[in-house]
């Protein structure tokens, strides 16, 4: 386990709730924070099994729900900060993604996010980025799960979207 901080967006939380694997992020990173906006997104209209998994994971401390971080980027004429603030205001990002990215930027944390546009913004802001598939690979490498493929198959069967090429590339890279 690393002593790093991980900021989770809603997509991976939903995926891990469907798999009943919400403990994996904290087992790998130690500290996992979820913004209030992301928490509202994942608990607003979840499937019943997802809600039970999310509530149980929060109660045992798998993650901490924290206030949204409204960063004051760009107030001091820093052009790189201005550019990062502009990325956070991308209308293609939903409020949860914006709040997760703002907190990750403010804390220099890794951001756990699946949505393509959010990942692109994180990369542009030079944040460490991890997705659900990458988290599952790390969990396998750490001996926390035996195989990735059955979990990916279960996610896809549940209706969770993962790009076919990304899945194929990821599974091929680990020999599954």
Annotate each predicted stretch with a short phrase.
Residues 119-176:
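Acidic, PIN/NYN-like endoribonuclease modules and their adjacent C-terminal/linker elements
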Residues 2-109, 116, 125-127, 150, ...:
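Active-site-proximal, substrate-binding regions of enzyme catalytic domains
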């Amino acid at each position: 386990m690393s002593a790093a901080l991980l900021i989770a967006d809603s997509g991976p939380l939903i995926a891990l709730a469907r798999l009943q694997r919400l403990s994996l992020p904290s087992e790998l990173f130690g500290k996992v924070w979820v913004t209030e906006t992301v928490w509202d997104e994942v608990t607003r209209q979840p499937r019943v099994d997802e809600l039970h998994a999310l509530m149980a994971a929060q109660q045992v401390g798998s993650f901490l729900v924290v206030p949204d971080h409204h960063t004051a980027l760009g107030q001091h004429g820093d052009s790189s900060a201005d550019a990062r603030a502009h990325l956070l205001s991308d209308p293609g990002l939903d409020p949860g993604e914006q709040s997760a990215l703002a907190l990750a930027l403010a804390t220099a944390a890794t951001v756990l996010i699946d949505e393509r546009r959010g990942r692109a913004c994180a990369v542009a802001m030079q944040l460490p980025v991890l997705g659900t598939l990458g988290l599952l690979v790390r969990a396998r490498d750490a001996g926390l799960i035996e195989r990735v493929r059955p979990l990916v198959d279960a996610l896809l069967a549940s209706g969770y979207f993962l790009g076919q090429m990304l899945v194929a590339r990821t599974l091929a890279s680990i020999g599954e």
